Amino acid sequence: KLSQSGLKSEFVGYHMETASSRILCIIKDSENVDAAFKGDTVEIITEETPFYGESGGQAGDAGVMAGTGFNITVIDTKRPLNDLIIHHCRITEGSVSADDRAELIPDIDNRKAARRNHTATHILHGVLRRVLGPHVRQAGSLVAPGGFRFDFNHFEALSAEAIQKIEDEVNSIILEKIEVKTIVLQYQEAIDSGALAFFEEKY
């Protein structure tokens, strides 16, 4: 239904920690509503958002929205479509209407923790391919502020020696404190620059 609505939201969180945006849509019990009130649990879509929507195995952001006459707790954020981000919310004070403006403020400590763990999955993947061989492919992942899970394919159980070598190499890279930069590229540009892409894998 949402995919046919034409609603779009732009993620601005790579270069902004907070943002002011217009509320495009409020959904309660799977229906569009004009307004929501204290105690309501709703989904909110805004024109722009600094909230990261769950995708690629990384958990979505939590935080708050606030505006004239309302405060909202953002419990979770999802990204069901590439250009659509949905905030799962609870109205904690006042009432909010479609077209209202809101300040969107993610929990930055949680965001940074999730980013660290997301980066760690890439480090681990690179080390696994170096230690075990280039056949190793990411088969799934879960990245959250408190930790991460990384699933991969290999033809045998890992020996204690291999596990220790992998841990040592990962820790060595972390201790180098290499600066991490976010660069948004077109697909072919990313592949040409050496990025690994296993898009036939679903997880």
Predicted segments, located by residue:
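A glycine- and charged-residue-rich anion-binding loop/surface
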Residues: K1-Y203
